[in-house]
């Protein structure tokens, strides 16, 4: 997996997402003796007051340490969950502060007042170089998701400079992402820079052959990515529930499988235009019900029996997709091949994880999307992937060709 690059030089890629100019990077920011406000993504799973998965926290450590080594004090700012009516205990970042302290190996002061309050301002003004504070959930502020001008001003007072290192939130035009950036000297953190560079390669400078694997339940969720990438790729392998919309569009029988009838014409059009590039499953694992203990059997993907539903790609397709990946120079995988949560329908996803992982040193490989990331971690191949994206919605919007407000703000 790609490490973070806190000493990153300006990106050589000319990203349209960043207004055609590279983002400002940390080495261009003078931080000695300054208080730096850092937007991180600490929207992590918490159970019984304890962080269950600290991946996003550890991913932010190199940027924080670089700032501390440069003589700064650091004020960390994040959202957590979707609180609707101001402060709620279950959405407090307090338990996260302890996990950040552990990851950094130093004390992190938690500031429980609202981020835009006078109390918070006084608390951060007392920080000395080398010290770190974590603000309370920025979504407790009513103006955050509205990119409220008054809140932007209040947040800007918390730092002498601003660093955006929350790629997972870079597609949101919120106060803590793009609003405050216009008020302070700013730069992209190492995590944001590595994400934009890695995904930028998929759009602007892919080596060929270029193979993309797209899975997941719905065509409608991924259609803009599919349409934007198809002209650029050599092969696109389709899996997951969305495969049945394509198979039905081609006249196949799909039984009770998931289908989006309102996407059939679109799927038909893509098959007519890019049929030579689009690879669909030839067999599927069908089940008599949507359950972990369902009866299952392997059938042709376009002959799912009535009353049955396809829940994974079959063994022939697994082999065909592994073969299609051989010789590739660039590979992007987003979305599971089947109902990965049920063990008996996880084989297709695991097979793709193994195939992508086996390409180390032969191809530039990027994996994005929660289930595909879980699968690559579970397969033990994560360290063989060039870049594992933490982005979710932000990754997809970038690959749709959209400008991300946070990335634009860092130019």
Swiss-Prot record:
| InterPro entries in alphabetical order | Phosphoglycerate_kinase, Phosphoglycerate_kinase_CS, Phosphoglycerate_kinase_N, Phosphoglycerate_kinase_sf
Origin organism is Deinococcus radiodurans (strain ATCC 13939 / DSM 20539 / JCM 16871 / CCUG 27074 / LMG 4051 / NBRC 15346 / NCIMB 9279 / VKM B-1422 / R1)
Instruction: Name the positions where substrate binds.
Output: 41-43, 56, 79-82, 139, 172
Q: EC number(s) for this protein? A: 2.7.2.3
Q: Which UniProt keywords apply?
A: ATP-binding, Cytoplasm, Glycolysis, Kinase, Nucleotide-binding, Transferase
Q: How does it assemble?
A: Monomer.
Subcellular localization(s) per the UniProt record: Cytoplasm
Q: Which HAMAP family match?
A: Phosphoglyc_kinase
Involved pathway(s): Carbohydrate degradation; glycolysis; pyruvate from D-glyceraldehyde 3-phosphate: step 2/5
Q: Which reaction does it catalyse?
A: (2R)-3-phosphoglycerate + ATP = (2R)-3-phospho-glyceroyl phosphate + ADP
Q: Which GO terms describe its molecular function?
A: ADP binding; ATP binding; phosphoglycerate kinase activity
GO CC, alphabetical: cytosol
Its predominant location is: cytoplasm
Report what the protein is called.
Phosphoglycerate kinase
Q: Which Pfam families does the record match to this protein?
A: PGK
Query: Some GO term, biological process aspect, for this entry: which one?
Result: gluconeogenesis
Keyword check for Nucleotide-binding, yes or no: yes
The family annotation for this protein states:
Belongs to the phosphoglycerate kinase family.
Positions binding ATP in this chain are: 222, 310, 341, 369-372
Q: Region (Disordered): which ranges? A: 1-24
